[in-house]
Amino acid sequence: MIISSLAFHYVESFGELAEKIARWLVPGGELVFTVEHPVFTASGSQDWHYDQEGGIMHFPVDRYFAEGQRNTVFLGEQVVKYHRTLTSYLNALLQSGFAITGVVEPTPSEELLRTVEGMENELRRPMMLIISARKP
């Protein structure tokens, strides 16, 4: 089993990586990974649009189908991420011989929604994506 958490969106060629992973895994081996959701990485800014009073208006989605490099800030540092569509993630896995076994767009738990201020805004757009696949 290979598990990756929030790393593949820093890799320029996911297709090449998927092919390598397929070679490394034995038949029946599994790949489970999380990435920032393509809706979240599309625009590059990764922030809400705010009104004049500072209230959240909406999350911008722009250039979704324009795959490639995005320069953004993460934890106060400039980083390079690579945006790709959901179709590109899934097709790269399928073309590398994987069978897709799961696709999840996680949402906050009821407890988080009750206890963390502003968490309800995380229901307005997907931020993360979890994909699982098996090598036949």
Kindly give the residue locations of the regions a language model identified.
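Short alpha-helix
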Residues: 68-69, 80-103
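A short glycine-rich, Lys/Arg-flanked "PGG" loop and its adjoining helix->strand segment in the class I
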Residues: 15-30
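Conserved class I S-adenosyl-L-methionine
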Residues: 30-68
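Short catalytic micro-motifs in class I SAM-dependent methyltransferases
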Residues: 6-9
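Core SAM-dependent methyltransferase catalytic element
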Residues: 96-98, 116-136
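Class I S-adenosyl-L-methionine
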Residues: 69-72, 106-123
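A conserved beta-strand element that flanks and buttresses the S-adenosyl-L-methionine
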Residues: 3
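Acceptor-substrate binding/catalytic loop of class I
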Residues: 35-48, 73-88
